[in-house]
């Protein structure tokens, strides 16, 4: 199972680097920062499905 450490999040701003991750909500997040901010917003219900686009 793929995991991402989101302990340093949320962050107020994310970089524009493109390293897509696919969330359990079937949405593609452009990078770890955007994904982790969404995880925090979801109170931990959002998880990583896999690396790369959904």
Curated annotation (Swiss-Prot):
According to UniProt, where does the site described as Reactive bond 3 lie?
Answer: 16-17
The lineage is:
Eukaryota, Metazoa, Chordata, Craniata, Vertebrata
PANTHER family from the entry?
OVOMUCOID-LIKE-RELATED, SERINE PEPTIDASE INHIBITOR, KAZAL TYPE 2, TANDEM DUPLICATE 1-RELATED
Name the species this protein comes from. Answer: Anseranas semipalmata
Subcellular compartments: Secreted
Mind listing the UniProt keywords for this protein, alphabetically?
Disulfide bond, Glycoprotein, Protease inhibitor, Repeat, Secreted, Serine protease inhibitor
- Domain of life where this protein originates: Eukaryota
The answer to keyword Transcription applying to this record is no
Q: Which residues are glycosylated?
A: 43
Q: Name one GO cellular component term.
A: extracellular region
Q: What is its main location?
A: secreted
Listed name of the protein:
Ovomucoid
Domain text: Avian ovomucoid consists of three homologous, tandem Kazal family inhibitory domains.
> Tell me, what is one Gene Ontology molecular-function annotation carried by this entry?
serine-type endopeptidase inhibitor activity
**Gene3D superfamilies hit by this protein:** 3.30.60.30
């Amino acid at each position: 199972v793929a995991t991402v450490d989101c302990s340093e999040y949320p962050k107020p701003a994310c970089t524009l680097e493109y390293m897509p991750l696919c969330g359990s909500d079937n949405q593609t997040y452009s990078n770890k920062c955007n994904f982790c901010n969404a995880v925090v917003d979801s109170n931990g219900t959002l998880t990583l499905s896999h690396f790369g686009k959904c």
